[in-house]
Amino acid sequence: MVPEDRKGQGLNLALSSAVNILLPWEASMGRRKLITNKMLNRAGAKAREDFDIRGSTDLPVLRLSGGNQQKVLLAKWLVREPKVLILDEPTRGVDVGAKMAIYEIIRKCAARGVAVIVVSSELEEVLGLSHRVLVMSGGRQRKILSRDEVTSEAVMELAVPIGKS
């Protein structure tokens, strides 16, 4: 899962991009495997290429822009080739260029068969990325809309029911 709060929950800001990317992999290996410099270099180069991360992946993540931090966070979980990817507010706090790059990463994941669940308060983001939209209101599921049913009006009518009980 890629959390909404990348700085507080998703990344170790003092560590480099490459180390952050390999942390879940190292944790899954237990004591059997340590991260080597060769692995760091390979992970950094692959992340720069696959996720268009700008700057050196040797720098602490804290020194990267918000968009590049978010791409590092995506790379961190995608390196494990998940079957399901949950993204909570995937583009919060990033610039328009980084948003477009992140959307492309999400679309490529879906095209490879990864089930992608996007939690977002940005309606345009939801409409642009989704095949189906589950609309909630008051902590309860209201309806699941198919791609053909999804419009901003339909979503808002379900999310903010006015005068209906």
Where are these regions (language model features)?
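Glycine-rich phosphate-binding loops of nucleotide-dependent enzymes
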Residues: 1-165
